Amino acid sequence: MNRWLAAGGILLGALVVFSFVSAGAWGGADGVAGDTITTINPSYEPWFQSLWTPPSGEIESLLFSIQAAVGGIIIGYYLGRDRPRGQSQDMGSDLP
């Protein structure tokens, strides 16, 4: 019962916090950087253009999610692989 109550409280808290954020606050860093550069130097021209633009926002989100998943797998593998090795070295030091 306490677990469900805690999960419900966390979910309710997240909903309250996110309900106060306007849609404009979710803009990306690229858009903010582009606006700042244009403000500083209106005659600025980019050095290069994208080689490929995803056909839709959903594809772009999918690629970002895959990138995050691969990064998480790599970090998880490293942490999972590194910890047992450190524990086995500690266990061997107690032997006479």
Swiss-Prot record:
Cited Pfam families: CbiN
Keyword Transport: yes
GO cellular component: plasma membrane
Signal peptide: none
Record's keyword terms, sorted: Cell membrane, Cobalamin biosynthesis, Cobalt, Cobalt transport, Ion transport, Membrane, Transmembrane, Transmembrane helix, Transport
Record carries keyword Membrane: yes
Entry's transmembrane regions: 4-24, 59-79
GO biological process: cobalamin biosynthetic process
MF term (GO), any: cobalt ion transmembrane transporter activity
Topology versus the membrane: Multi-pass membrane protein
Subcellular localization: Cell membrane
InterPro entries, alphabetized: CbiN
Pathway in which this enzyme or protein is active: Cofactor biosynthesis; adenosylcobalamin biosynthesis
Subunit (UniProt): Forms an energy-coupling factor (ECF) transporter complex composed of an ATP-binding protein (A component, CbiO), a transmembrane protein (T component, CbiQ) and 2 possible substrate-capture proteins (S components, CbiM and CbiN) of unknown stoichimetry.
Known role: Part of the energy-coupling factor (ECF) transporter complex CbiMNOQ involved in cobalt import.
Family affiliation: Belongs to the CbiN family.
Protein's name in the database: Cobalt transport protein CbiN
Organism field: Halobacterium salinarum (strain ATCC 700922 / JCM 11081 / NRC-1)
